[in-house]
């Protein structure tokens, strides 16, 4: 990848949930120590908000806690605003019936967070990284169609990678058995995105596989 620093950016929750449900979050630590692993604040909140309810949320909460030195959380004003909205809505949804009734009567029901909320947040994150580290390559690790679509997301110095393509790359290096790991994932998450997308940046040559530590 010709001396450029690689920033692995998670703009949507899909890859994290897939790897967590399959029991393979540790594969993210295959990136070399100099690689920045960046998770949007909204994405982290979404995948860790119900640790007492979902196994994958508990696994991700533990993973973030145990690897805090490795995982960089990108905070944005918009992300923090939407997180506050989500917390308010969750509090309402989990409130006792009498509390809900009062909130509904007084018009104090929190609004539902906007759909497609992650797109604006990741654009903010991507542009912030581009401003602070203009020579870095961003590896957008995603399952959302917005990011995997060739015509939708095309920031400079940006390489797009789907979960399946990531696993295929590790298999080419004989780090994993693709069939075994993918079977673990789809057994717990049948709707995991099966699309293999490994799209290089349009403006420079990029190669994420050279940032994988094969010696662990």
Listing of model-derived features with the role each one plays in the protein:
Residues 141-145:
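Short, well-ordered beta-to-alpha junction loops that form the rim of enzyme active sites
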């Amino acid at each position: 990848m010709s001396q450029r620093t690689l920033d692995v950016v998670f703009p949507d929750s899909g890859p994290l949930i897939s790897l967590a449900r399959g029991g393979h979050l540790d594969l993210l630590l295959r990136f070399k120590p100099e690689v920045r692993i960046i998770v949007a604040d909204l994405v982290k909140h979404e995948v860790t908000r119900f640790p007492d309810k979902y196994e994958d949320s508990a696994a991700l909460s533990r993973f973030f806690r145990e690897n805090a030195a490795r995982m960089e959380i990108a905070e944005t004003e918009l992300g923090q605003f939407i997180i506050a909205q989500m917390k308010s809505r969750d509090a309402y949804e989990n409130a006792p019936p009498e509390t809900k009734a009062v909130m509904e009567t007084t018009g104090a029901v929190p609004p539902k967070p906007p759909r497609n909320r992650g797109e604006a947040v990741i654009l903010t994150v991507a542009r912030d990284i581009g401003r602070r580290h203009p020579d870095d390559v961003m590896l957008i690790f995603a399952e959302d169609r917005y990011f995997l679509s060739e015509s939708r997301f095309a920031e400079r110095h940006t390489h797009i990678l789907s979960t399946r393509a990531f696993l295929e790359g590790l298999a080419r290096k004989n780090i994993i058995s693709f069939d075994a790991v993918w079977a673990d994932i789809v057994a717990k998450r049948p709707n995991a995105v099966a699309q293999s997308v490994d799209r290089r940046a349009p403006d420079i040559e990029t190669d994420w596989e050279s940032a994988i530590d094969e010696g662990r």
